[in-house]
Amino acid sequence: DINNVYVNAHNHGIDAIRYLDVLPRHAVRQIHLAGHSEDALGSGLLIDTHDAPVCDAVWALYAHAMQRFGGVPTMIERDDNIPPLAELLGELEIARGIAANTRLERAA
């Protein structure tokens, strides 16, 4: 879950890229994408709620994950605040674009 990696890295002050880089390549069979929320008390704490669009930082982390782990299946999760279908399809197109770019870069 790329959003979970991002949220935990933010909350615990660790490097999300480094976290992904130490995972064994063979262990990653599927990637999940989701959004998160910020703590309502304004503490800066992020919460992996799966109820918001995928943010730019998570898309960037996803691109890194695809470079590292190759063409593993990806799913976009929404557990609450389900948006209109057009918005979900927009996120799907972003994920497909990142995956396609990764395939081209790996083939070069």
Give the positions of each predicted feature:
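Active-site beta-loop-alpha junctions enriched in small/polar residues
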Residues: N3-V7, A34-E38, E77-N81
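Rossmann-like AdoMet/SAM-dependent catalytic core
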Residues: V58, F69, P73-M75, L88-L89
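Acidic side chains
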Residues: D1, D48-D51, D79-D80, E91
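C-terminal helical cap(s) of enzyme catalytic domains, especially alpha/beta-barrels
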Residues: L85-A107
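Gly/Pro-rich active-site loop or hairpin
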Residues: A9-F69
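Short active-site-adjacent structural elements
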Residues: A40-G42, I82-A86
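Conserved, mostly hydrophobic/aromatic
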Residues: D1, I31, T74
